[in-house]
Amino acid sequence: MSGKTRILFFLTCLSFLLVFPTRSNGQDLALSCGTSEASADQDKKKWEPDTKFLKTGNSIHATATYQDPSLLSTVPYMTARIFTAPATYEIPIKGDKRHLLRLYFYPSTYTGLNISNSYFTVEANDVTLLSNFSAAITCQALTQAYLVKEYSLAPTDKDVLSIKFTPSDKYRDAFAFINGIEVIQMPELFDTAALVGFTDQTMDAKTANLQSMFRLNVGGQDIPGSQDSGGLTRTWYNDAPYIFSAGLGVTLQASNNFRINYQNMPVSIAPADIYKTARSQGPNGDINLKSNLTWMFQIDKNFTYILRLHFCEFQLSKINQKVFNIYINNRTAQADTTPADIIGWTGEKGIPMYKDYAIYVDANNGGEEITLQMTPSTFGQPEYYDSSLNGLEIFKMDTMKNLAGPNPEPSPMQAEEEVKKEFKNEKRHAFIIGSAGGVLAVLIGALCFTAYKKKQGYQGGDSHTSSWLPIYGNSTTSGTKSTISGKSNNGSHLSNLAAGLCRRFSLPEIKHGTQNFDDSNVIGVGGFGKVYKGVIDGTTKVAVKKSNPNSEQGLNEFETEIELLSRLRHKHLVSLIGYCDEGGEMCLVYDYMAFGTLREHLYNTKKPQLTWKRRLEIAIGAARGLHYLHTGAKYTIIHRDVKTTNILVDENWVAKVSDFGLSKTGPNMNGGHVTTVVKGSFGYLDPEYFRRQQLTEKSDVYSFGVVLFEILCARPALNPSLPKEQVSLGDWAMNCKRKGNLEDIIDPNLKGKINAECLKKFADTAEKCLNDSGLERPTMGDVLWNLEFALQLQETADGTRHRTPNNGGSSEDLGRGGMAVNVAGRDDVSDLSSEDNTEIFSQIVNPKGR
């Protein structure tokens, strides 16, 4: 080979390596299944074809017919390997090493296949990872388009990792599929874990096979796999969606130049960014002693779980300055005479460490939930009464070589749709066969009808549904459209809990109460239909929302609102009394809100103008309602349609958030967002949500920012009659604020009546809500606190101050000990119903270890 040829060959190889990085240790492998060519994902990671590793079994390769917008990369999701019989991959490994295994699933439409028929088992060597698994049902339940399952496989005596896919024999035409397989050799990061509730007993995690359930950057932002440590490409998610109760505490952040010193553990345990942020209870020790930080997670019961808590102190430097108790499912992990003391464990600040705790979860100990609670300890009379956490990982341990949990159960409505689909297929087949033999057709038809009636009986039964399922009736993945009309022909199918929590009205009752839906009783019109003023039980005033059969909103939104509102009770959320779903009509019955919508009092109205103080109080009430949805309910709820017509006011000027037909449950165990069809109202719609079709609670924050400017300026969110730059209120107000002439566009009725400091605080809050990046927007807790503070400033200026903000902190960034502090608002206890008080404060405020 000539010198020039060698150089050309070297440069060619070098360019290839730059595009496709080599395996870091000779043991890492990423397979793009169903493709014949090497490719790279968005992070330039190389994905190889899977063909040479597929050793047994017949298979076909397929390409998805639709690319979901939530897919960050087509690799490895758009191609798949399909198995109609058992098949095995054999991947060479170093058997004496632990390995990360990731399985990538995209349950899309593949030509000639019905993804709902895909049920299969996956085994890695002798460990069952998935059993009778349906990626379609799981993604539908999680309201996302794709799924990644991650496992940490213990060392073995085999130098080959055999991954076997077996279609289920319980379903006709069942098949298995896989889009991507990733195998990464990793150092041994596990040892023993203290068994919670048992003194001096441990679980051996070093020999265990584990499934990664949750991996959280507590108090910080998402950390993508490309920024992980040790080459393990793990993704760390923000913890806020998993915080239970309204108390978010404060988020802490070390200064940029703060150094993390890995003295006592390998860097691959967690990246430095995990230890540079934290969440603590806050600066008020008196409040902290009466409350705690609580996280809640949904898991599979009858397994042992390892909770790895990451700690690093970057503020304090002495022992006994901050000590705290740790409880897991109300059992003591660290408390009494051995509370947690980070400096006591590490010796100095800047040194990261972790603690592993193991707990077995069954019906008698948590059921399908794990709660982690932290509260200050008074043992030793520490200098500060506080607790803090930097990171959290939760792993499921294998039981008798099994890690497989059940598929989530479909909602009653989803189950009914499956029955309808199957019954139609059965009728079609019966008709075809009938053309060949009438007697046989009658027999088959009878059998089909019997099966159908049995399945309908199941629908009416008490169907246990996994508690982390999305709100019933919502679209399951982006690109999915409802096939259910707006007319209810067969009645709704609600969970027993929802049906038991609200009243079911007969259609004659509704017609009598609204004078047969007389137009003179119409008090509003929305996307769902008309809203009527009515009377029930002789004297009780109600609002009745009647569906319009031609509306785009239909059964989905109807059931969503019932399932959601029947379980929520809060001073600042409109109360659902009951519903009616008979005679082809769908009606929702609410408490009557005497003063109507907020918008009615802002512009295009003959009603008296609202004072600035009253507007602030209404904004605060609405913020409390949204804050409760995001953090105070059992699971994060995203409203998705926040606007001034969905904020109602009662006769005492108490604001209540309404209209939950588009609401969705928030981020789940596999990500920090929900992938969904974009819905909402133009003018209020979060542009980031519109672009990415990824929904978070920060989308509500954006919409609320528009509401705040609407309150201030008394003009619509969109006004096409104005010059182009003024059409969007959000854009126009932001532009005026940046130029320093915001006062020129505020409501003329308010000019000269708003304290300057109050106006600045209010406008700054609205501006932060409208940040282009959701990550940079405040939480609703932050918004609530700032609005309370703005009201305090106004009352001080007016000489009418009679209340203080609900928490003693500040939502501003404060320089303190080389860190930034962000205080989240704490909602008023008085805003919760007695039921809420009992549930939250009996379990959260003062947990008792067992």
UniProtKB/Swiss-Prot annotation:
Molecular functions (GO terms): ATP binding; protein serine kinase activity; protein serine/threonine kinase activity; transmembrane receptor protein tyrosine kinase activity
Residue ranges crossing the lipid bilayer per the database entry: 430-450
Cellular localisation: Cell membrane
Record topology, Cytoplasmic segments: 451-850
Main location: membrane
GO CC entries: apical plasma membrane; pollen tube tip
EC number of this enzyme: 2.7.11.1
Cross-referenced SMART domains: S_TKc
Record field: compositional bias (Polar residues): 839-850
Residues reported in the UniProt entry to bind ATP: I523, G524, V525, G526, G527, F528, G529, K530, V531, K545
This protein's UniProt keywords: ATP-binding, Cell membrane, Fertilization, Glycoprotein, Kinase, Membrane, Nucleotide-binding, Serine/threonine-protein kinase, Signal, Transferase, Transmembrane, Transmembrane helix
Deleted gene: phenotype: No effect on male fertility and pollen germination, but siliques slightly shorter. Anx1 and anx2 double mutants show defects in male gametophytes due to premature pollen tube rupture.
Residues with glycosylation annotation: N114, N132, N292, N302, N330
Entry keyword annotation includes Kinase: yes
Active site: D641 (proton acceptor)
Signal peptide region: 1-26
Further facts: Male paralog of FERONIA, a female factor expressed in synergid cells that controls pollen tube behavior.
Protein family according to the UniProt entry: Belongs to the protein kinase superfamily. Ser/Thr protein kinase family.
General function of this protein: Receptor-like protein kinase that controls pollen tube behavior by directing rupture at proper timing to release the sperm cell.
Protein known as: Receptor-like protein kinase ANXUR1
Gene assigned in the entry: ANX1
